[in-house]
Amino acid sequence: MESLDFIKAEMITHVPINTHIEPKRVITINGGKRVQRELDKYEFIEEVVHLDEMGAVEGLKNLGPKKFDVAIVYTNLYTNNREFWIELTKLLDEKGVVAVSMSNIFTQKEEAKEELKLAGSIYPIVMPYRYERGVESKKLISEYLMLASRFYHPTADINLQRADLTDGYAYYNSDIAIAAFATPTFIYKEYLGIIKR
């Protein structure tokens, strides 16, 4: 399979950064150099804390009273882990935004529903969004991320100027960011009350 890893790194980073009005403090889990490279495109980010995938729940607990604007979770290891979501949410400010890897809403429906329900029990806005993972047998393979937000909406509150005028994107732009949240009617109906717009 031809890898398009840079697309996931851009979509999991720039969607939440450009949803939040003033993201200054960011926490990443399993993002490493991929996410840091994307965050380096923004001069206004003042602090980035990286946690490893293994032991992330304990790592969150050990951060103390810090507050973050954006959380980027590059793994889906914790997407259906209530303790993880609770500890992560404690570290976000009242308008915090989370982007996290999740199950595919077409091919892993039961898992995706459980993940969305869990996040939706904590956040008023919970929406899956698509990105292209790679090319396999000349077919484009799509996967999903989730944006969970306490206040900002990813399509209504997107900072268009920041999304389109920041240098260095290979894939991401405001049109892609908005279109990534589009879902077919039959999927929207199946996830009615679970996807929280």
Regions found by a protein language model. Give the residues of each.
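Conserved Class I S-adenosyl-L-methionine
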Residues: I86, E111-R133, M146-A148
